[in-house]
Amino acid sequence: MMMFGKISRQLCSLKKIPWSCDSRYFWEWLNTVFNKVDYERLRDVGPDRAASEWLLRCGAKVRYCGHQKWLHDYNTLPGSSIDRYKIQAIDATDSCIMDIGLDHMVGLEHVEKITLCKCHYIEDNCLQRLSQLENLRKSLLELEIIACGNVTDNGVIALRHFRNLKYLFLSDLPGVKDKEYLAQVFKTALPSLELKLNLK
C-alpha cells in the first residue's frame, strides 16, 4: 500500500497531459486492441467468422452471401453452422479498421464489395496490403473509398492489382493529387473498370 501511495504521488506531481490528448491516445490504443489478430481464433473458427468478429468489433458492417440484411451488431453474429456464412460485402463506414487487422482478411474468398468511408486509420499501406491479398484480388468487384484523409496517390495506384475490379469510386480524398495520371493507370491496367472520381 505504501508503494502504491508513493507511485501515485509521483504520478500526480507530473505535468498533466491535456484531457483531449490523453483521450486520443486511449482511443488509439483501444482501436489497436480491437484490430489485433488472434491467430488461434482464426484457426478455430475460420476466416469468415474471425473477420466478421473483427469488423463488427471495429464498427463495420458485413453482409453474407445469400443474405440481403447487413449485420452490424456483434451480439447477433450467427452461432451455428458458422462455416456456411461467407462474407460477400463489407461496409467499413466510420470504423476503426487499420492495417494491423488486415490479416483477418487473408482467407476471405467471397468478398465482392468493400466500402471504406471516413476510415481515419486507412492509409496507403493499408490499400497496398489489401491489394496483395490473393483471394481478394480474385473476388473483389466493387470498391468505394470516401473521405479517408490519409490516402494518397500511392495507395490508390496499388488498387490496379484487383484484376477483376469492375467499379471504383473515389471521393473526398485530399491526399490524392493527380487524378489524370490515376485515370490513365487504371485505363491501362483495368480497361473494363468503371472509374468514378469525385476529387478536387
Swiss-Prot record:
Q: Which InterPro entries match?
A: LRR_dom_sf
Among the GO biological process terms of this entry, one is: proton transmembrane transport
Q: Quick one: where is this thing mainly located? A: mitochondrion
Sequence segments annotated as region (N-terminal domain) = 1-61
Indicate whether Mitochondrion appears among the record's keywords.
yes
GO terms assigned for molecular function? metal ion binding
The reply to whether Transport figures as a keyword in the UniProt entry is yes
Q: Kindly state one GO CC term assigned in the UniProt record.
A: proton-transporting ATP synthase complex
Transit peptide interval: 1-25
- Ranges that cross the membrane: none
What's the family? Belongs to the ATP synthase subunit s family.
Q: How does it assemble?
A: Homotetramer. Associates with ATP synthase.
| Name used for this protein in its record | ATP synthase subunit s, mitochondrial
Annotated organism of origin: Mus musculus (Mouse)
